[in-house]
């Protein structure tokens, strides 16, 4: 199940952590309750027992965690930010309460991972897709490798400092530090459902990585696989670039014969079959993708060459 908040880029840049957490949780909970209600309505209509097919995975978009995850650069030790710890581990009112109260699920979400020197200065930062099978201690981040110029780093910013001001004027927020590109092209094994010993190799794609075919194919293995793309297309506002992005991504399915699910903050959240066909997408009654909501889908996870 993919969750979309449809936040504008400017609002995304000045977001308050508590409000984002609450909005993600509320939207996820409402989506699960809607699935339950639909199953019950269908059972009543057909005169049969209700079959509740609840989501095994919940996917939140790129940079959904408004508070960065911090690590010690020299050791890789994670600093337990209390807000993030509570959000994932507290028994009441947060993710764990949702798991206990409605259904257990594995969370895949966008995070910003910051590595600090022993003196407390920022050494490097990564834009990640992170898997949480349980509480905060279960975090498994995968860092984005294909960074976007003027979106995740400013080329030659020391030589041309005016570029930073130009970026801030167009994006509505300061750039901050440049992201560091990740290096791993290994799929991330994720249980098909919580507690299962059977796994699917997730091909983790952040933002525009889903359009770079030469990069995506490095993750292909002869095993059950699924491409997961988390993105924030708020930069495009309501232009046709949102549609162009996901339609370009659909070619990765055709090329690699792998399904894909895209969770967009703003843009097109869609589930695609291995032939690029749309299994499900999130749109309002007018057909516009610029809406808040959830998208639930079941995808094939074959390992065709």
Language model feature labels by segment:
Residues 1-305:
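Enzyme catalytic cores with a strong preference for nitrogen-chemistry domains
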